[in-house]
From Swiss-Prot:
Entry EC no(s): 3.4.16.5
Active site: S173, D394, H451
Summary of subunit composition and partner proteins: Heterodimer of a 32 kDa chain and a 20 kDa chain; disulfide-linked.
Cited function: Protective protein appears to be essential for both the activity of beta-galactosidase and neuraminidase, it associates with these enzymes and exerts a protective function necessary for their stability and activity. This protein is also a carboxypeptidase and can deamidate tachykinins.
Subcellular location(s) per record: Lysosome
Protein name: Lysosomal protective protein
Record carries keyword Kinase: no
The family this protein is said to belong to: Belongs to the peptidase S10 family.
Annotated keywords: Carboxypeptidase, Disulfide bond, Glycoprotein, Hydrolase, Lysosome, Protease, Signal, Zymogen
S-S bonds: C83-C356, C235-C251, C236-C241, C276-C325
Length: 474
């Protein structure tokens, strides 16, 4: 009846319903995470975001350790394609890092959630704990961007208290494709407070990545003079070399040899000066499972590059995809522990967690050869700060190729290339790498770091991240 007062019970129910819709989802909160000697003071959540009608992306969200209400929200995506972003959480810059025993977590003094609310999403469907109802895992760059955007929208629906916070999109490796394609969608959505993006050792251009890698390999002493001379003779003309899609038969043979040296000879493609975990990579078999260690990102135009994995899939063998020269045993053991899965609210029906998914990678359709148009669109708005950073001893996505890519965008130079410094306490300030700043886009190297910068140089990575978020000079 009009004007009738609500009963106290009904009022209480309505208030509780409203509060649930204005705050983080209680059912996703991690109450007790196995492996920690002491549970964290910050709140963390694990559950699922709706990426499409049939796709469910697993997320793990760690609130900032310092003033979460006013800290930015930072999305992190690992690459592959086909690899889990929990690699970033547990081995790079998460609040706690997995130890070699695969059981223990130790707090990370350089965790990125010291100053930000960090959202880790496993993408695309089929990766890690993410899944699709129809179990169809064929996808492509455009669909993944749309799925990531829908998942991000769902995150802000579940966590409306963060919708006005500054938003930064970040990632690594093949996230060099994921992040700018997602950013182009997000920039058109006024409900999201996008401030910028940062990509570490990202794949921005296949052509520049391949062309630069040959120079990187030669000047790091990996190619002999005979091979280098032959490359110059058969792959170059008029002072310009094409190591990307050259059709000269001798050039192709030379590039196959470069590809073998860089990726198959026992060198660590992710960090030239680090040992290769497990020894020389190749055809490893564990428990009747064949392990493949090639993501198909370098020298993609060479013949025979994809025939071996395709033949493997037809053979019916169990195949696993692992990052080369990387020991994934500890994170795999941890995330497949039934108590951990329960703490993370993972359905029992889902298969085991693997760092990377072979089928997702093999069936993935790469639609873009360059991110040039995406970055130019983002830069044309003059609203966003963009950082491309590279560990300078990575060969998978080497620093030179990404620097060439930034140069090709032809943005106005504001700060010439110079060293940037990190304070190492008793050791004093040290050169951490080099940086050059153009209008709204910065290129930065981290000296002595490989593909996974926060793993190799955690203090430098955190310093860079802090300066990026706070718009401070590097």
């Amino acid at each position: 009846m009009p004007g009738t007062a609500l009963s106290p019970l009904l009022l209480l129910l309505l208030l509780s319903w409203a509060s649930r819709n204005e705050a983080a989802p209680d059912q996703d909160e991690i109450d007790c995470l196995p492996g920690l000697a002491k549970q964290p003071s910050f709140r963390q959540y694990s559950g699922y975001l709706r990426a499409s009608d049939s796709k469910h992306f697993h997320y793990w969200f760690v609130e900032s350790q310092n003033d979460p209400k006013n800290s930015p929200v930072v999305l992190w995506l690992n690459g592959g394609p086909g690899c889990s972003s929990l690699d970033g959480l547990l081995t790079e810059h998460g609040p706690f890092l997995i130890q070699p025993d695969g059981v223990t977590l130790e707090y990370n003094p350089y965790a990125w959630n010291l100053i930000a609310n960090v959202l880790y999403i496993e993408s695309p469907a089929g990766v890690g704990f993410s899944y699709s109802d129809d179990k169809m895992y064929v996808t492509n760059d455009t669909e993944v961007a749309e799925n990531n955007y829908e998942a991000l929208k769902d995150f802000f629906r579940l966590f409306p208290e963060y919708k006005d916070n500054k938003l930064f999109l970040t990632g690594e490796s093949y996230a060099g494709i994921y992040i700018p394609t997602l950013a182009v969608l997000v920039m058109q959505d006024p409900s999201m407070n996008l401030q910028g993006l940062a990509v570490g050792n990202g794949l921005a251009s296949y052509e520049q990545n391949d062309n630069s890698l040959v120079y990187f390999a030669y000047y790091h002493g990996l190619l002999g003079n005979r091979l280098w001379t032959s490359l110059q003779t058969h792959c170059c003309a008029q002072n310009k070399c094409n190591f990307y899609d050259n059709k000269d038969p001798e050039c192709v043979n030379n590039l196959l040899e470069v590809s073998r040296i860089v990726g198959k000879s026992g060198l660590n493609i992710y960090n030239l000066y680090a040992p290769c975990a497990g020894g020389v990579p190749g055809r490893h078999r564990y428990e009747d499972t064949l392990v493949v260690q090639d993501f198909g990102n370098i020298f993609t135009r060479l013949p025979l590059k994809r025939r071996f994995p395709e033949a493997l899939m037809r053979s019916g063998d169990k195949v696993r995809l692992d990052p080369p020269c990387t020991n994934t045993t500890a994170p795999s053991n941890y995330l497949n522990n039934p108590y951990v899965r329960k703490a993370l609210h993972i359905p029992e029906s889902l298969p085991r967690w693997d760092m990377c998914n072979f089928l997702v990678n093999l069936q993935y359709r790469r639609l873009y050869q360059s991110m040039n148009s995406q970055y130019l669109k983002l830069l044309s708005s003059q609203k966003y700060q963009i950082l491309l950073y590279n560990g300078d001893v990575d060969m998978a996505c080497n620093f030179m190729g990404d620097e060439w890519f930034v140069d090709s965008l032809n943005q106005k130079m504001e700060v010439q290339r110079r060293p940037w410094l990190v304070d190492y306490g008793e050791s004093g300030e040290q050169v951490a790498g080099f940086v050059k700043e153009c209008s709204h886009i910065t290129f930065l190297t981290i000296k002595g770091a490989g593909h996974m910068v926060p793993t190799d140089k955690p203090r430098a990575a955190f310093t860079m991240f802090s300066r990026f978020l706070n718009k401070e000079p590097y």
